[in-house]
Amino acid sequence: MNEEVREILGGLDFESTKDVAVPERLIDQVIGQDHAVEAIKKAAVQKRHVMLIGSPGTGKSMLAKAMAELLPKEELEDILVYPNPQDPNQPKIRLVPAGKGREIVEAYKEEAMKKAQARNFLIFTLVFLVIGYTVLTNPGNLIWGIIAAVLILMMSRYFIPREDRNVPKLLVDNSDKVTAPFEDATGAHAGALFGDVRHDPFQSGGLETPAHERVEAGAIHRAHKGVLYIDEINTLTIESQQKLLTALQDKKFPITGQSERSSGAMVRTEPVPCDFILVAAGNLDALMGMHPALRSRIEGYGYEVYMNDTMPDTPENRQKLVRFVAQEVVKDGKIPHFDKYAVAEIIKEARRRAGRRNHLTLRLRELGGLVRTAGDIAKSEGSDIVRLEHVLKAKKIAKTIEEQLADKYIERRKDYKLFITEGYEVGRVNGLAVIGESAGIVLPIIAEVTPSMSKSEGRVIATGRLQEIAREAVMNVSAIIKKYTGRDISNMDVHIQFVGTYEGVEGDSASISIATAVISAIEGIPVDQSVAMTGSLSVKGEVLPVGGVTQKIEAAIQAGLKKVIIPKDNIDDVLLDAEHEGKIEVIPVSRINEVLEHVLEDGKKKNRLMSKFKELELAAV
C-alpha cells in the first residue's frame, strides 16, 4: 500500500470496506461525539432527559435511537381504552403487560360475536314466525306481515345495543417490541403528539361511533417507558411546549379532541401513562424559542450536550472515518464496498470540509451523501467496488445548492464582466465570500470617496443588506487610514458598492478588501485585478483569520484569478484537491501593509504610502 494512503487511513491495511468490522450497537457506531455518548449512557441508566444542540448531520437522531437500545430492560405495557357506562365522554384507561392487550381485545371480540350471532338468530326467528303466522292465518295480509318483519329488524337495530360497543380499543401495542420504544415526533402537530379524538359525523340515531373507539394515542403515549425524540423543538408552539412540560412532570396525560369544532372535543379520557425520556434536539437558535420552564426541566433533570462539528485529525479518528464509510455501505445496502484509495479520498474530503487545520468534519450526513453518490456511480458503471475515480466523479455531481448557485454566479458574472481578472483599477478589489456553509464566490467591491455632504460628519454609504457589515468594517479601517495616510475621513463620504451582491453573504471577512478599496480610492493608487483577497482586520492593522478559506480559494481559481491573499493564520486550513492544486498563488499576510505591498500598482504614490507605513512601524518599535 502507498505510504501516503496508509497514513491517511490511520495505519489500517485492508482491501475494501468489506474487511472492516461494523459494530452492532448504534451507540458504538457514533463517531467523534465521545462527550455526548457518555452523557447518553448515563442518562439511559438513570432515565434522565437530554437536550442535544448542534449543527445538522452531527448524529443527534442517531444518539436518540441508540438511547432506546441502552435503556434498562423492564416490563413494557399495552394501553387499553374502555367505554365508561357512567360517562361515555370519559373513557377508562387500563394498563396490561405487553402482548396481553391483543389477547383481551380478541377475547372481547369473540364474546361480542357470539352474542351478536345469538341475537341475530332470535331476530330472524321472530321475523320468520311473524311472516309464517301471517301466511297461515290470512294469506291476503302477507304484505302487512312483511312490513311488520321490517319494523322488527329496524327496531332491533336502533333499540337493542350493539355488542361490539363494549369491545375495548388497543391504544398502544408493544407486543412486538424487544427493546424500549422510540418515537420520533419531529414536526408533529398537537394531535399527533398528545393524542386526539376523531370527529363523529353521525352523533345520534344509533349510528354514532362510541367515544372510546375514536380515541387515538399520541407520540408521548406510544413512547411510554421509552424515548421521545423531538428535533427542532423550538418549532413546537408555546402551548404544545407547556403540555409537553405537564406530561414530563405528571408522567401521564389525558387524550382529548384537539379541534374545538370536532365532536371529539367533548371527549376526555382518564389520564394515559406517558413515562418517557425526552431527547430534544436543535441548533443554537432552538434555545431562543424554547419555553423557559421546559428547558429548566431538562437542565434540572437531565443533561445538555453541545455536539462537536469537528474532531482532531489523528490516526485513531481517521480509522473511525474508515469505519464510517463501511457503516454507510452496510446501512444503505444498495451500493458496493469502497477500496482503500476511495476511502482515503473520502477522508481527504472530511479534512477539507472541516475548514479548520488538523481537524476532520463531523457533519457526517453530508459526507454520507458523497459516499452514496460515489456508490451509485460505481453501480451504474457495473463496478463491484467503489474506486477513487468514482469518488472524484461524485464530488463534481454531489454539490450543494449553494455550490451550484456559486458556479452559476461566477459563470454569469464572467459573461457580463462584473468582476475583472486583469489590469489595474482605482478603488476596485476582488473580495471573497462564502454562501451558506460550503460555497465560495468572488465578491467585487468598489469604493469611492467624496467630500462630505454633511457639515457635521462624513457617512458610510453601502448597498442593501451589507450596510451594517460595511459600516463596521469601515469604522475599523478608518483608524488605519488616519494613522498610515494622515487623512481624516470624518469629513468625507465613503461610498462602498458590493457589485452583484448575493443574498446570504455575511461576516467581516471582507474587511481587508474594503480597507484596500478605500485606501486605493483616497490615495488614487490602482489595485491589481488579478488578485483576490479575504481576511478580517483589527484597528491596529493586523490581518485576522476567517472561515471557509478553501472554498474561497476554489472560487478564485474558478473565476480565473492568479493570486489570492489570505490571513497567515489560515495557511494550514488550505486543503485544495488535486483538481485545484497549483492553479493559483496563495499569499499569506499578517498586516494590512503586506496586503497593500502585493496589490497596489508600483509607482511614486505607492512608494510614498509604503514609506509612511515603514516609518510608523519603526517609530512603534
UniProtKB/Swiss-Prot annotation:
Alphabetical list of InterPro entries matching this protein: AAA+_ATPase, Lon_arc, Lon_proteolytic, Lon_Prtase, LonB_AAA-LID, Mg_chelatse_chII-like_cat_dom, P-loop_NTPase, Ribosomal_Su5_D2-typ_SF
Cytoplasmic compartment segments: 1-117, 161-621
Keywords, comma-separated and alphabetical: ATP-binding, Cell membrane, Hydrolase, Membrane, Nucleotide-binding, Protease, Serine protease, Transmembrane, Transmembrane helix
Enzyme class name: hydrolase
Pfam families membership: Lon_C (PF05362), LonB_AAA-LID (PF20436), Mg_chelatase (PF01078), Sigma54_activat (PF00158)
Catalytic site positions: 509, 552
Entry's localization field: Cell membrane
PROSITE patterns, alphabetized: LON_PROTEOLYTIC
Cellular component, GO annotation: plasma membrane
Cell membrane is among the record's keywords: yes
Sites where the protein binds ATP: 54-61
CDD domains reported for this sequence: AAA
Translocase found in the keyword field: no
Membrane topology per record: Multi-pass membrane protein
Ranges of residues in domain Lon proteolytic: 423-602
Function field: ATP-dependent serine protease that mediates the selective degradation of mutant and abnormal proteins as well as certain short-lived regulatory proteins. Degrades polypeptides processively.
Assembly behavior: Homohexamer. Organized in a ring with a central cavity.
Protein name: Archaeal Lon protease
Classification of source organism: Archaea, Methanobacteriati, Methanobacteriota, Archaeoglobi, Archaeoglobales
